[in-house]
Each structure stands twice: as structure tokens, then as C-alpha cells.
Amino acid sequence: MLVVKKTPYIKGILSAPPSKSYTHRAVICASLANGLSNLKNPLNGADCLSSAHACEMFGAEIGLGNEKWIVMGSELKTPDNIVDIGNSGTTLRILTGISSQISNGYTVLTGDDSIRKRPMQPLLDALKQLGLICFSTKNNGTAPIVVKSGKISSNVVEIRGDMSSQFITSLMMTLPFSEDDSEIILTTPLKSEPYLNITIDVLDKFGVKIGKIEEKNKSGYKIKGNQTYKPCDYTIEGDYSSASYLVAAGVLLNSDIVIKNVFKDSKQGDREIIEIVKKMGADVEINDDNVKITGPYELNGIEIDVTDIPDLVPTIAVLGCFAKGKTVVYNGEHVRLKECDRLAACTAELSKMGARIEEKKDGLIITGVHKLNGAKLKTYHDHRLVMAFTIAGMLADGETIIEGEDSVKISFPDFVDKMKSIGSNIKVI
């Protein structure tokens, strides 16, 4: 458990952790490239390590270091055991598609209790459209998933754009193996598009090209067939999702902090946290590779469309508690499909602290109260809730006890140490 007490002042220089999204994609691409790749500044978090270990089961040789991963990619081989991806939904979804391209046999992918409840049916249906054989062992669209090796026999696949961008990322990374050119056609408006832009960016660095389809009655992506992943040296940038908690702390608390390793021109959708706090009234300074914050600032509630930024919702919920007026979060139905139902969780847990939050079908309405009280909070094994609630606890009267703090190892392994380094009144018990 994490014990958090009111923190009067934070000061210091700290780096955002490496991007989880970029690390996942880079290590998988490098494993599919025949040759040696050097991945600099990878995230040594539990989820990304799950991707690395899974890639080893498919034949890659990976040397894991704190500052660099050395990946010797090769042709895909059939795993000699069940592939257990722990708690990493990204790993499960990307490798479900990729595993169809082993030379022969079957792959079985599974994970922990949480992963075995996360929806997979839209991806399974899409892969079946391509002529591939894959299914849930429980016949309910959840892991364990069985995938048979097979040739892609169709060049068009239709999939919803409003469920999970990870399904589309899986298709993008699988279809280059097809002998023919392919199209991914979206049947609904796209959500979380920045994550797909990250996928396209990483694929490009590893020699695979993805094009966009933007026609009057058709939208999606086009992928050339017979493409080959190529090894490269790749540096992974800092993670704006993780930096959002540092930004929130900076604008809400008496502060003087510099957050390094976040880039002004990043393709990450969650860079929007900077624009959000600016619109709320925080005069933060964004430079080419860092953000400077001298808080606190008086914030005003605003309306925020979270279509492309679902991972920012817990941070926004905390910001809204201390803003004047109402903060409205909308277009967030997909936020319910993360590690937990984050809309319900933020409502239930922050309400324990005295927050005024109304849960809507697609979002939240947060009425600023400017004062929270310490409470005992559940986090439902969700790393983003732990970190967002920590910021709330640093501003609350009394003591806040946060359960499940070990989940931060997924995306921000040294979160507690970094927060302590700038003066946060927190400890693990």
C-alpha cells in the first residue's frame, strides 16, 4: 500500500519514463527484423518486458539492459510453450495477429486474471476475415487465445474504429506479411488515432510503410504486401501519459519543477495534457524537450473530448476536483475497456475523498470542490489510477491510503522514488 499525506511544496528536475507504447512496438518490430537492432532508452516496465519475453518465445534473442535492449531478430518460430503475457493487453493483441505468421503449428496466448477478461472478439473476427484460424478457448472472445499458422487469403478487412486501437495496430503489423496489398476499412469513426500514428511511425523506422485511406465514403489504412521488417537503431522518447501525473502535481501544488524527456513535436496523443492545463489556466512552459512548471495555478473547468486521449482521464478527473466550476469529460466510452472501467473507478474512489463526480455513459462531470479528504482507495490493479490518486492524496487533508501500488511497475517503475525526489510526502508500507 501507498500512504500519501498533504505535500506543501515540490521542487526538482526529473525525467519522464520512456514511452510504453513506443517500447512495445519497437521491440516487436525489432524481433521481426532479420538482424541486429539497438533500442535505446526502453521502458523496463512489466508490460514491455512481457513483450520482450514473448518475442523471445517466437525466436528473437534479446539482451535486456537498463538503458539499451539489443535485439537479434529472426524468422518467426513456433513457441514451445504457452505464451503468458502477464497483464499486457498490448502484447496480447499485437501478438495474436503476428502469431498467425509462424511457419507451422499453433500459438496459445494467455495472461493474468485481468487480461483473461479483456475483449478480443473484434480482433479475432478481423483475422478470420483474412482467412486465418483463431479462437477463444472459452468461446467468449477472451484469452486464452489459440491461433493457427496460416496464409493471409483476403486483402480487405473491416473493423470498428471505436473499440480499441490495439486491434488495428495488430492488423497493421501483421498485414505486411501478406503476399498481396491489403486494406483495413473502418466501419465506425476512429478513436485513439494517436496510438495508430505511433504504430505507423515505428513501423516506418523499421522499413514498413502504412498509408491512409481518406475518401468520401471510405476511411482506413492501406498496406503493401511482401514488406520486410528491417533492423535499425532506435531511441524511445519519454511518455506523456506518465508525465501527466507530474504535470498535474506541478500545476496544483506549490511547485518549481522541470520535466525532461518530453518532446514538443511528439506524435503521442497524450501530449494534449499540456494544452488541457493551459486551457484550464496554467501558464506552463513547453520547450523542445522539457516542460517547466511553477505552480500553483487557479484552474477553471473546461469540456474535454477524450476520444484520442483515454489514458488521461484519471489525471483529468483529479484536475477537475480542484478547478472552478465544472469539468466535463465526454466521448469516453472506450475508457471503460482499459485495465478496469476507469469512469466508474474514478467516480467511486474520488467520491470517497469528497469529490463531486457524476458518471455518464461516455464520460464524467466533475464539479470542483477545491478540497479533498484523505481516504482508503482501491485501484483495481490499474497503474494509472494509482498515480492519479497519489496526486489527489498530495492535496488532500489527512492521510490517503492507496491499495495496489505495485501496479505502477507496468508503466512507471520508479514513480514513488521520483515523486519522493521532488518532495512528495509518500511512502510504501
Swiss-Prot record:
Active site per UniProt: 311
Residues involved in phosphoenolpyruvate binding: 20, 89, 118, 166, 342, 384
Top-level lineage group: Archaea
Binding site for 3-phosphoshikimate: 20-21, 25, 164-166, 192, 311, 338
Catalytic activity entry: 3-phosphoshikimate + phosphoenolpyruvate = 5-O-(1-carboxyvinyl)-3-phosphoshikimate + phosphate
GO CC terms, sorted: cytoplasm
Protein name, per record: 3-phosphoshikimate 1-carboxyvinyltransferase
Native source species: Methanococcus maripaludis (strain DSM 14266 / JCM 13030 / NBRC 101832 / S2 / LL)
